Curated annotation (Swiss-Prot):
Changing R392K: Moderately decreased betaine transport. Contains a negatively charged N-terminus and a positively charged C-terminus, which are both involved in sensing and/or transducing osmotic changes to the domain responsible for the translocation of the substrate glycine betaine. The C-terminal domain is directly involved in K(+) sensing or K(+)-dependent activation of BetP. It is a multi-pass membrane protein. Disruption phenotype: Mutant shows strongly decreased glycine betaine uptake. It is found in: Cell inner membrane. Optimum pH is 7.5-8.5. Residues 81-98, 159-185, 258-276, 324-365, 418-451, 511-520 are periplasmic. It comes from Corynebacterium glutamicum (strain ATCC 13032 / DSM 20300 / JCM 1318 / BCRC 11384 / CCUG 27702 / LMG 3730 / NBRC 12168 / NCIMB 10025 / NRRL B-2784 / 534). Residues 581-595 have a biased composition (Basic residues). This is Glycine betaine transporter BetP. The keyword Membrane applies.
């Protein structure tokens, strides 16, 4: 294995036929800026993607430790349920008590970091060759990233979260406050999750398609730890943590989906009281479906399913909007956005010491859980975003990833959460016994034609999970094969089975507290990866700072500054010469008059 510069330049320029200074070269480029684009486009033809040339051999040093952890979790959770559940609860308490502040702080740091990157000169850099066109159409690109990023979460929490905050209140606020309920929900589901995904996705996309490294999370750390470090034990540890976070994050989604589909079957009177075997059956069907989708390839399976998801989700949202309290939803939407913006920093600063020290338990169940869930999803969502974003500029990537899903989430929660709150205000509560997985179907069945829409909702839950798990298993296959862009289908399928095993373990070991068990284990599994995402920020900035476009931009700025100084000096000399000339003319004129 050959070593290379830990900060490789993404573009290699040919030697110049004659020696000229950077200032002279930039002067010529300023006179004809199209020369710069042509020069960089020619040079970028030399980019070689290591991931495309790497043999599809299995990386056992990454696979074995990850599988050992998965198998140990399954054996522990199924064979010793009480011990496993107690450990998960104790570990959660330790994380929230000692590292809750880190989740809260860096969750918001990630948002500001990615916004600054988009607004900076880095935003013009393309994720690939300078003339490379995007691989997917914009509509398909948006639908794929949204379905992979949080589709099933919107289905599960879209109704129950705003209603819960409205009924029970939020630390530091009274109950029955619509503005606080909606703004807190938006805080959890708009900018913060997608900022995390954008950081991971951008780091991988730049490293892979711009610089030409392997499509591995560890490869994005080359600017910090060097090529040897990325290929050594530290790089392997990063990839192992990425796989573990992905398995548990996806398993949490599988668990939520299975619980809610079971509730839908009960609400439709298909199965009166879903048993553990019903849940096993649901998980098995979903697992087979997403494995089939994954092995069909990203260009086919995920794209088709994602487009279908968007159609079904739009149909469901339009139904609730039209048949439900339309005017109330329209009134709620701008108010929710205003409350979110005005209370952003107050919500971002909420810690265990808030509300006279009573907010800790609430944060562990909501904000910290969400931040951990997004972080656990970030390896596979980030890598998936990278795979579908080749050819787009950094600014286009960030704006698309950050704003479009955030806007859709805002509309979704306003429709479903707003409708649930209006029902509550009118004395037609859908709260039931407080089971979160039942409330979406309670809302739908309270509307005319809701029985049919309930069936569509169950189908949508399944397809949303399939797209998410499809992305996750494909990405885990890539990480298991040295960054191979097209992972072996059987490796992909194996990780799908492992994810299903973890999901069933968390559901069955939790018993009546299955949802809490899912949340607890997700937070614990995601904690190590928080520090990986923090490190990615530094690696990304160092990588971007060595991009030739940015370096040319800095050189151009220096040239412009030197040129401006020279102009000032020249103008000053010119002023002095003119002043001296006027003095001589006045002196000569005075001498002529005396004669």
């Amino acid at each position: 294995m050959t070593t290379s510069d830990p900060n490789p330049k993404p573009i290699v320029e040919d030697a110049q036929p004659e020696q000229i200074t950077a200032t002279e070269e930039l002067a010529g480029l300023l006179e004809n800026p199209t020369n710069l684009e042509g020069k960089l486009a020619d040079a970028e033809e030399e980019i070689i993607l290591e991931g495309e040339d790497t043999q599809a051999s299995l990386n056992w040093s990454v696979i074995v430790p990850a599988l050992v952890i998965v198998l140990a979790t399954v054996v522990w959770g199924i064979g010793f349920k009480d011990s496993f559940t107690n450990f998960a609860s104790s570990a959660l308490s330790a994380v929230v008590d000692n590292l809750g502040w880190a989740f809260i702080l860096f969750g918001t740091v990630f948002v500001f970091f990615i916004v600054v990157i988009a607004a900076s000169k880095f935003g013009t850099i393309r994720l690939g060759r300078i003339d490379e066109a995007p691989e997917f159409r914009t509509v398909s690109w948006i639908s794929m990233m949204f379905a992979a990023g949080m589709g099933i979460g919107l289905m599960f929490y879209g109704t129950t979260e705003p209603l819960t905050f409205y009924r029970n209140g939020v630390p530091g606020h009274d109950e029955h406050n619509v503005g606080v309920a909606m703004s807190t929900t938006m805080f959890h589901w708009t900018l913060h999750p997608w900022a995390i995904y954008a950081i991971v996705g951008l780091a991988i996309a730049y490293s892979t398609f711009r610089v030409g490294r392997k499509q591995l999370l560890s490869s994005a750390f080359v600017p910090l730890i060097g090529e040897k470090g990325a290929e050594g034990w530290l790089g392997k540890l990063i990839d192992i943590l990425a796989i573990i976070a992905t398995v548990f994050g996806t398993a949490c989604s599988l668990g939520l989906g299975a619980l809610q589909i079971g509730a839908g079957l009960s609400a439709a009177n298909i199965i009166e009281d879903p048993s553990d075997w019903t849940i096993v059956g649901i998980v098995s069907v979903l697992t087979l479906a997403f494995i089939f989708s994954a092995i069909s390839g990203v260009g086919k399976g995920i794209q088709y399913l994602s487009n279908a998801n968007m159609v079904l989700a739009a149909l469901l949202a339009i139904f609730v909007f039209v048949v439900g309290p339309t005017v109330s939803i329209l009134n709620l939407l701008p108010g929710s956005i205003g409350n979110y913006l005005s209370n952003f920093f107050q919500m971002a600063g909420r810690t265990a010491m808030s509300a006279d020290g009573t907010a800790g338990e609430w944060l562990g169940s909501w904000t910290i859980f969400y931040w951990a869930w997004w972080i656990s999803w970030s390896p596979f969502v980030g890598m998936f975003l990278a795979r579908i974003s080749r050819g787009r500029s950094i600014r286009e990537f960030i704006l698309g990833v950050l704003l479009v899903p955030a806007g859709v989430s805002t509309v979704w929660f306003s429709i479903f959460g707003g409708t649930a709150i209006v029902f509550e205000q009118n004395g037609e509560s859908i709260w039931g016994d407080g089971a979160a997985e039942e409330q979406l179907f309670g809302l739908l069945h309270a509307l005319p034609g809701g029985q049919i829409m309930g069936i569509i909702a169950m189908i949508l839950l399944g397809t949303f999970f399939i797209t998410s798990a499809d992305s996750a298993s494909t990405v885990m296959g890539t990480m298991s094969q040295h960054g191979q862009l097209e992972a072996n289908k059987w490796v992909t399928a194996a990780w799908g089975v492992a994810t299903a095993a973890i999901g069933l373990t968390l559901l069955l070991s939790g018993g009546d507290n299955a949802l809490s068990n899912l949340q607890n284990v997700t937070i614990v599994a995601a904690t190590p990866f928080l520090f990986v995402v923090i490190g990615l920020m530094f690696a990304l900035v160092k990588d971007l700072s060595n991009d030739v476009i940015y370096l040319e931009y800095r050189e151009q700025q220096r040239f412009n500054a030197r040129l401006a100084r020279e102009r000032r000096v020249h103008n000053e000399h010119r002023k002095r010469e003119l002043a001296a000339k006027r003095r001589r003319e006045r002196k000569a004129s005075g001498a002529g008059k005396r004669r």
